[in-house]
Amino acid sequence: MSFIAADGTMALNQDVNLEMAGGWSRAFTPHSFKLKGNKELGGNKNLNYPFFTAKPFIRNRTLQIRNGGNDTGCRIKDAALQSIIQTSGIDIDLQSYQPIHEFINGKYMGVLNMREPNNKHYVYANYGWDEEDIDQFEMSPDSGYVQKCGNEDAFNRLCELSANAADPVAYNEILQLLDIDEYINYMAMEMYVGNTDWPQNNIKG
């Protein structure tokens, strides 16, 4: 992987793993994929460069190069919406975005979206927490509930408490498990932008 900054300097040059990414969007070209640092290939475990200037830099272990997902026409809808929300002052976690010109073996592929990962590595990149310190899951129609790291105890307890959320004692315990303000902001934003690939898909927590 070679990353040339806007000023023309070689900002990063190292061997990485390349992995195809996306669901339905795998059928579209250019393809979406993930880049992962790998010591075994003679590179580094991390990708040590601040690709996303809108957030403080801690480290990057993986990057997503996206073709726009289901937005295959202009390819910027998701990135534009997240950028607008990011600069709005709303308290909500989201993936930073950087447009890039992609070349593969010298062949120009077009303008794609470089994004932060939306997996366990996101937590370290934004909060400095290792995967041993978190519980992370994903849900989709194809896979159902999948525990990515940690365990499901806190999520199961949250579901139990939610059935009786009007009870003050239960609600106070919910507040210990869930950032309720950010959760409300998240739900409001998904509904406001009209995300049609959610909530039946793309659930992560």
Language-model segment annotations:
Residues 1-186:
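Phosphate-handling architecture centered on phosphoinositide signaling
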Residues 35, 178-205:
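Active-site acidic catalytic loop and adjacent metal/ATP-binding pocket
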